[in-house]
Amino acid sequence: EFAFAETVSPAAAQKLLQAFERSVSASASAASASGRAMKWWETKNAQYAFLTDLDPAKGKKFVADSMKLMTALRKGFEYYVPPKGEMAVGKVRVFRRKADYQAYRKATGTVDLQSCGLWDPNRDELLIVAESPEEALATMRHESFHQYLHYATKRGDHAPWFNEGHATFFENVKYNPAKNTIRVIDTGNRA
């Protein structure tokens, strides 16, 4: 089951974001007092901007590998759904802990206790929880198609069968990091 963000007015979204930032600031202060500071850092390339609170020592490799994966996925997405013009830089927010992801979702207007990531078109963010790297990458393969489709077609009102069908299709590709390519695997499973 996949969760989608509800529409929130810009003014309400701004208030929610400010509340979240105060909450994160309080969490960071508490974490800092306990020796576990939550610091966000960003890495960009031509296609994506990653913002994360992962420990930089381990997180830099995860983010670099994720950027490579998403670059390979983008080629596949473009083959099946060619973009209509220039694409915006995709924003990806990676959370170290699911509890922080849930707090962020709650602060931005959605209580979400089940998902470990999603594409939020209202905030133009792909959100991912990285507690389990394998689950994070599977979620990223799926949700990044929603993000791509939104930017590639300059709209967000796609038929659910098309949007979810393609996202599920790309969720199951096999990635070859040495060649930075994806391979479609048809297991015969159908929705």
Segment roles from a protein language model:
Residues 1-39:
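N-terminal low-structure segments adjacent to metalloprotease catalytic domains
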Residues 6, 14, 22, 92, ...:
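Residue-level marker of intrinsically disordered, low-complexity segments enriched
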Residues 156-191:
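Post-HExxH zinc-binding segment in Zn-dependent metallohydrolases
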Residues 1-11, 102-103, 184-191:
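Short, charge-rich amphipathic segments
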Residues 37-159, 174:
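Juxtacatalytic substrate-recognition/specificity segment
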Residues 20-31, 101-105, 148, 187-191:
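Generic hydrophobic, helix-prone segments enriched in Leu/Val/Ile
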